[in-house]
């Protein structure tokens, strides 16, 4: 029993020491956490101080930007006022030139209508006379063509007759020669066939007799080997007999073909005789027709001579009357030439006016194209610099030296609240001009482009809506524009004659609305 108690006491002492060590560890952890919280609090306090300082700096920058914006709006107002004066002067000049051109064009139209009316009267009078002469000439030429056609028919009949006679003679000669040749070839073929048949029969008889004698002698001399030689000789004789039989059949076929050819030649001969009879009858009828046509030709030649004499007399009379009318026509031509000279002078004046207007338009177009190129280059440079700055700030924030900037996009996202494209679009607005004196060089390229587009619109009489704060533009030493202060009235519906009078959709590089001007 006492041993067990001693063991129990030893265990109790061990447990008490473990609890004390745990309390010391928890107190050390709590102190370390307190130190961390203090360090974090000091860090956040430093961040708050830095943020407050940056907020104050941003506020000062915003005030400076607002002041600069107000100055730019004032500059814009002055620029618009100067531009309106320029446009009013150009419009007055353009209106005067347009009125002069319209008056000259109206006079030109009257002169053209008068000359065209006089010309139409002369043309109608002469056309009536020409139509009468042409009708008479058509009648006479129709009669003459009919006579020529009948003469050609007679000549054609004569040629046909000579050709038919020559063909008939050649056919007769050919038929005679073909008949003679056919008879001779038929006789030769029959003779050859008869002689060949006799020769073959004689050769066969001789061969048979020779073979019979030879077989008899050989049968007597060599009765043992006689059977084999007789068989071979018999085979050879049979082959020779077959050959002669085939040759005889071929000669029979040749005889049949020659007989058919002879019958066809006989039929051809009969046909040629019938054709000869028909040709003779046709030639006789042609002889009678030729005699009739010859008599008719003589009468037509006499009538043609009479008609040609009458036509010559009428032609002489028409030439005499045309000579009288030519004097009147020359006087009208001289008057028309004088009118044309006057019209050419008017055209030259109008052309010079148009050239002056075109030079002004080309100057505006070149300036607008230059502004658009500069806008494109400036926007590209701004995007690159903004992206570079944004990446640098992100790298600094990752390193812990700066705060993380706002998320910024560079791809013109539709739902983005901080995109570079919106800043580029804001540079096109006019609300940053507040000063009373603004130089053209102080404007952005976007504002210069908008100003040039507005000049195009004002030059062509396009009305623009009013702006709430119209700025003014002051000319610099290098870009001064001086015009009279009184503004001319806008033209409601100008004619689409010049380059600058195209629609604004074809002239502007972006779809934004032009800024409005306040009427002075």
Swiss-Prot record:
This is Basal body-orientation factor 1. Residues 479-492 have a biased composition (Polar residues). It is found in: Cytoplasm, Cytoskeleton, Cilium basal body. Residues 1-34, 468-492 are annotated as: Disordered. Residues 22-34 have a biased composition (Basic and acidic residues). Keywords: Cell projection, Cilium, Coiled coil, Cytoplasm, Cytoskeleton. The gene is bbof1. Belongs to the BBOF1 family. GO terms for biological process: motile cilium assembly. Residues 27-175, 245-386 form a coiled coil. GO terms for cellular component: ciliary basal body; cytoplasm.
